[in-house]
Amino acid sequence: MVTANSTVKVGNVTFSNSAPLALIAGPCQMETRDHAFEMAGRLKEMTDKLGIGLVYKSSFDKANRTSLKAARGIGLEKALEVFSDLKKEYGFPVLTDIHTEEQCAAVAPVVDVLQIPAFLCRQTDLLIAAARTGRVVNVKKGQFLAPWDMKNVLAKITESGNPNVLATERGVSFGYNTLVSDMRALPIMAGLGAPVIFDATHSVQQPGGQGGSTGGQREFVETLARAAVAVGVAGFFIETHEDPDNAPSDGPNMVPIDKMPALLEKLMAFDRIAKAL
C-alpha cells in the first residue's frame, strides 16, 4: 500500500513538518497577465532575500463565489499561458486549484501542484484524477471535516499511486459566517504522514459574511500564523495583494504585499525556535 511521503519536493522547494518553513503565496485569483507578473516578481524578490522556498499560487477560476455576479478569473487557457511564462521568468513552481476531473489533465503539463478546494475535498473522482497526473496534490481540509477525517481523503490519493500529497488546514465552521482554527488539528493531521500547511488567510474568512461576498478579518492573520508556527507546520499558504480592499475576491482576508516581508521574517524566526526544541 502506498502511503503519504513525509517529505514532498516541489521543484526546489521542500515541504516537511521537520524542515524549515516553505511558502505558498500569491493573489487569490489571476486577474491579468501584468498583475500576475507584478505580484510574482515582488514575491520572488522577497523570498529570495529571506531564503524561504516559494510556490506561487493563483486561481484561474473562482468557481465557488458567493454571488453569480462576482468576478471569477481569467480562465484556464489564458492562465496556463501565464503560469508557463512565470515559471520561465522566475524559476519557481506554481500551484492552482482544479474543480473537475477534466481540468486535471489540462493543468498538469504546466502546473506543479494541483490543489483540491476545501468544498471538494471528498469528491473521490476528482481526487483520483488529480493523483493520477503524478503531480503533487494539495488538499484543503473541508470546513466541515474533523482533522482525523483527512485520513480517508489522503488515502484516496495515495492508494491511487501518488504519495506526494500535502494537507492544508484552513479553519472549521463555527456557527454562521464564522471559521475558527483549532491548533490541535495540525499535529493530528501531521500524524497522518503528510506535510501540513496552514492557510493563514482563508482561516480568517467570514464566509458569505458581506451578503453578496465573503468577509474576513485580516488583522488576525498574523495571530493565527504565529500560533500555527509555534505548534509546527511544513509551510504556510498566504494570499496577498498590493491593494486587498479593491481586489476582485477575498480582499478582506488577504495580506497587503508590502506587509509580507515583516510577517515572513517573524514566522521564520518562530519556526527556527519551534523546530530546534
UniProtKB/Swiss-Prot annotation:
Keyword Cytoplasm: yes
Location of the protein in the cell: Cytoplasm
Keyword Transferase: yes
Keyword annotations from UniProtKB, A to Z: Cytoplasm, Lipopolysaccharide biosynthesis, Transferase
Pathway membership, UniProt: Carbohydrate biosynthesis; 3-deoxy-D-manno-octulosonate biosynthesis; 3-deoxy-D-manno-octulosonate from D-ribulose 5-phosphate: step 2/3; Bacterial outer membrane biogenesis; lipopolysaccharide biosynthesis
One GO molecular-function entry: 3-deoxy-8-phosphooctulonate synthase activity
GO terms of biological process kind: keto-3-deoxy-D-manno-octulosonic acid biosynthetic process
Enzyme Commission number(s): 2.5.1.55
Record-linked Pfam families: DAHP_synth_1 (PF00793)
Catalytic activity as recorded in UniProt: D-arabinose 5-phosphate + phosphoenolpyruvate + H2O = 3-deoxy-alpha-D-manno-2-octulosonate-8-phosphate + phosphate
GO cellular component: cytoplasm
Superkingdom, natural source: Bacteria
Main location: cytoplasm
Family: Belongs to the KdsA family.
PANTHER family reported in the protein's UniProt record: PHOSPHO-2-DEHYDRO-3-DEOXYHEPTONATE ALDOLASE
Protein name stated in the entry: 2-dehydro-3-deoxyphosphooctonate aldolase
Organism of this sequence: Brucella abortus (strain 2308)
